C-alpha cells in the first residue's frame, strides 16, 4: 500500500501558493495531500480549499509555535512571505527564520523556499546609483527574502530555493496600467529600458512547485529560477494593445524620474525595475525551458493576456 505524503503550503489562500494547493488537489492519484496553512481558516478561500479536499490549518508566520504545529508530520513544506502584508523586509526575514526552524524541528524531507535576490549584493548601501530605501534596503520586497536564504541553509533542511519573476497578475490590479499620453495614445511607461522582463502567472508558479516536490533528487539544494516568458516593454505594450482594443506604446523612462512619480511605492518599483534593466542577471536566472519541463501547460504572455483579457481593467 502506497503512503500518501503531506505537503504543508504556507499562504495557500493566496495566488501563488494557492496555485500549488490546487495543483496538489487536482492530482488525487499523485500520492500527495495538501495541508493548507492560513491565518484565517474561516475565510472563503480557505473554505473553498477545504471543499476540494485540503486540510486547513491555522498558523501565523510571526508565531513560531503555530508553525511547528502546522508542519508536524509533513513530508514537504512550501515556505513564503509577503512583503505587501507587513511592508517590512526585516519582518519577512524573521518570518523566513521561523519557517526554517519549524521545518527543521518537524523533520521535513523537502522544503521549497520562495526567495528573491538580495539586491544589496550588487548595490551596497553606500552605492548611490540606486537609492537606499528606509530600513537599509534597496528593493525591500526582494532583499528580505534573499536574506532569509541563510536560515534554510543553516538548518540543513533539504531545501529548493525557488526564484520567481514578475507576476503578470499585477496588470489585473492596475500596476503599470497604460495611461493616455499628450497625444491621446495609451502609454506604458516603465524604467525598464530595452531589457527583457521575465514574467509568469501565479498558477504556473504553483504547478512548477508541485513538480519540484515530485523530483527531490534533482532539485534539493538547488536554486531554481522559472519564467513563463521574457518580454520587452514593446512586447508588453503589444499584448496590452489587444486588451485595450487600441494601440499601446512603450515609453522607457529613467528610474530617477519614475521613483518620483506621485503614487505609493514608486521608489520601490523604480529600484526593482532598475535592477532588471541594468543586466544583473535577473533575466538569465529565470529559465522558460526549465519551467516548461516542470509544467508543460506553461503560459506565455500572449496566452495569459488572451485568457485574462476580461480581468484587466481598461478604464484608467
Predicted segment positions?
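Rossmann-fold cofactor-recognition segment
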Residues: 50-63
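Short, functionally important structural connectors and interaction interfaces within domains
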Residues: 53, 189-192, 223, 286, ...
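A hydrophobic C-terminal alpha-helical subdomain
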Residues: 219, 255-316
Amino acid at each position: 500500500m502506497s503512503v500518501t505524503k503531506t505537503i504543508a503550503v504556507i499562504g495557500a489562500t493566496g495566488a501563488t501558493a494557492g496555485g500549488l494547493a490546487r495543483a496538489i488537489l487536482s492530482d488525487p492519484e499523485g500520492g500527495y495531500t495538501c495541508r493548507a496553512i492560513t491565518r484565517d481558516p474561516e475565510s472563503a478561500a480557505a473554505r473553498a480549499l477545504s471543499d476540494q479536499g485540503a486540510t486547513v490549518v491555522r498558523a501565523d508566520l510571526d508565531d513560531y509555535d503555530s508553525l511547528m504545529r502546522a508542519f508536524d508530520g509533513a513530508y514537504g513544506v512550501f515556505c513564503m512571505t509577503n512583503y505587501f502584508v507587513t511592508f517590512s523586509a526585516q519582518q519577512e526575514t524573521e518570518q523566513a527564520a521561523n519557517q526554517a526552524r519549524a521545518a527543521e524541528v518537524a523533520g521535513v524531507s523537502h522544503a521549497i523556499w520562495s526567495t528573491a535576490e538580495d539586491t544589496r549584493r550588487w548595490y551596497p548601501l553606500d552605492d548611490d546609483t540606486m537609492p537606499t530605501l528606509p530600513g537599509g534596503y534597496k528593493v525591500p520586497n526582494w532583499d528580505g527574502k534573499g536574506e532569509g536564504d541563510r536560515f534554510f541553509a543553516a538548518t540543513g533542511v533539504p531545501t529548493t530555493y525557488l526564484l520567481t519573476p514578475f507576476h503578470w497578475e499585477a496588470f489585473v490590479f492596475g500596476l503599470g496600467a497604460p495611461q493616455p499620453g499628450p497625444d491621446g495614445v495609451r502609454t506604458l511607461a516603465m524604467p525598464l529600458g530595452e531589457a527583457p522582463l521575465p514574467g509568469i502567472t501565479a498558477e504556473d508558479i504553483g504547478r512548477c512547485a508541485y513538480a519540484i516536490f515530485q523530483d527531490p533528487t534533482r532539485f534539493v539544494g538547488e536554486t531554481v529560477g522559472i519564467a513563463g516568458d521574457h518580454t520587452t516593454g514593446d512586447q508588453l505594450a503589444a499584448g496590452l494593445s489587444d486588451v485595450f482594443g487600441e494601440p499601446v506604446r512603450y515609453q522607457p523612462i529613467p528610474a530617477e524620474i519614475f521613483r518620483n512619480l506621485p503614487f505609493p511605492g514608486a521608489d520601490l518599483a523604480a529600484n526593482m525595475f532598475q535592477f532588471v534593466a541594468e543586466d544583473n542577471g535577473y533575466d538569465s536566472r529565470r529559465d522558460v525551458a526549465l519551467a516548461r519541463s516542470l509544467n508543460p501547460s506553461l503560459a506565455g504572455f500572449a496566452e495569459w493576456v488572451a485568457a485574462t483579457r476580461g480581468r484587466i481593467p481598461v478604464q484608467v
